[in-house]
Design a protein with these regions (language model features):
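N-terminal export leaders
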Residues: 3-16
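C-terminus-biased signal that marks the final domain/tail of proteins
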Residues: 27-41, 49, 55, 62, ...
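Short acidic-glycine loop/turn motifs at beta-strand connectors
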Residues: 34-37, 100-102, 172-175, 181-186, ...
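Structural recognition of the beta-strand scaffold that forms the well-ordered cores
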Residues: 41-43, 105-108, 169-171, 179, ...
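Proteins synthesized as precursors that undergo proteolytic processing into mature forms
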Residues: 120-158, 162, 251-259, 267
Length: 354
């Protein structure tokens, strides 16, 4: 992501949206702009009621990866990364968003209605919290990633001493897109135009059916303005559908950032649609990933100055994961070299204490 595109968008303004307090709704949004004519661009907001301590991570090739976090399993999946990747490390333990050197993008969002299969230890087990890490480490395209997920058993792992429902979105430079959800113990995949937008519960099929009630999609209702997942899904879908063709890759990034601002949750905002008046899940950060040109940018809600990395400038050969904390970074612009020289992570945060 380059400075011109970010300034054009007035500057870039969810680890897992973790529902630690019963009754509090969650929020995260992902949008893929793949028809703008200039670049394949993915935007994502992370909304959480606690600080996820977002850091940029650089995962080199041949890095050891493990399939489970808080569970003990005799057949947990293990691997060494085939591709280098960069993304957001949340709570010191989970890659919640990122892009690899081949341009595959992955976003991990909360979905409370997820239902995973009963564990079958004859099949290698993969934590749902490791989904983004696994696909970015090992696959170059959306279809490769889906095929890889079909060979393992994804299970609900424990983070912060409890189980979380999660779903995964995927995109690659060809324009391919997919959403992976776990419904009644089975993995379900939605591809194509129906997978360009993802928020939270209810699941994607419900969201697509609900969207038809609104004027941009043949219904009678005006666009909803609340912060609940269905309202954000409809707004994001509508604004994505009306984006003009981009004049440049910079314009494609800036235009998508405008969509993301319309689904971001301001500090103190409350959800008046679901009755969750306690809802204060503000947007912590927003990412814009240009899959065509290999740029990955992030802006913290607490810092008006965005930073980004350029994939071709990152060092993909190394001995461990490098971690660059973002809060108080005191920099703006391209931080590729800063990330290349960032400290190695020597210990993963305990999943019960992050």
């Amino acid at each position: 992501m380059r400075r011109r595109s970010l300034s054009t968008a007035a500057g870039l303004s969810l680890l897992l949206a973790l529902p630690l307090v019963p009754g509090i709704a969650n929020a995260c949004s992902r949008v893929f702009s793949n028809a703008n004519g200039k670049a394949m661009v993915v935007g994502r907001t992370m909304d959480l009621f606690i600080d996820d301590r977002a850091a940029l991570a650089l995962r080199p090739r041949a890095l050891a990866g493990g399939g489970l976090l808080g569970l003990k399993d005799a057949n947990a999946l293990h691997w060494r990364s085939r591709y280098g990747s960069t993304g957001v490390l949340s709570l010191g333990a989970v890659i919640s968003d990122g892009i690899n050197e081949r341009g595959l993008n992955a976003n991990l969002l909360y979905l409370g209605t997820s239902r995973y299969p009963d564990r079958n230890t004859a099949i290698p087990g993969l934590s749902n919290a490791k989904l983004a890490e696994y696909v970015l480490d090992n696959f170059a395209t959306v279809e490769e990633a889906i095929a890889g997920l079909e060979r393992v058993q994804v299970v609900s792992d424990r983070v912060l001493n409890r189980d979380w429902g999660l779903h995964l979105s995927l995109a690659d430079p060809s324009g391919a897109s997919a959403v992976v959800e776990f419904v009644d113990g089975s993995m379900k995949v939605k591809r194509g135009n129906d997978s360009l937008v993802m928020t939270n519960e209810p699941g994607l099929n419900w969201q697509l059916n609900n969207r038809r009630r609104y004027k941009p999609f043949g219904g009678t209702l005006p666009l909803p303005g609340d912060i609940d997942p269905p309202s954000r899904f409809v707004r994001a879908s509508a604004y994505l559908s009306t984006l003009p063709k981009a004049a440049s890759a910079d314009d494609a990034e800036a235009n998508l950032y405008g969509v993301m601002k319309n689904v971001a949750v301001p500090a103190g905002a409350r959800d008046y649609s679901t009755g969750d008046s306690e809802d204060t899940w503000m947007t912590l950060w927003t990412t814009i990933a240009n899959l065509s040109q290999g740029h990955y940018g992030i802006q913290l809600n607490s810092d008006p100055d965005p930073v980004w990395v350029t994939l071709k400038h990152l060092h993909w050969n190394g001995s461990g994961m490098r971690v660059l904390p973002l809060r108080g970074i005191g920099r703006t612009g391209d931080v590729s070299e800063l990330l290349n020289g960032a400290p190695l992570q020597t210990k993963t945060a305990p999943t019960g204490a992050v």
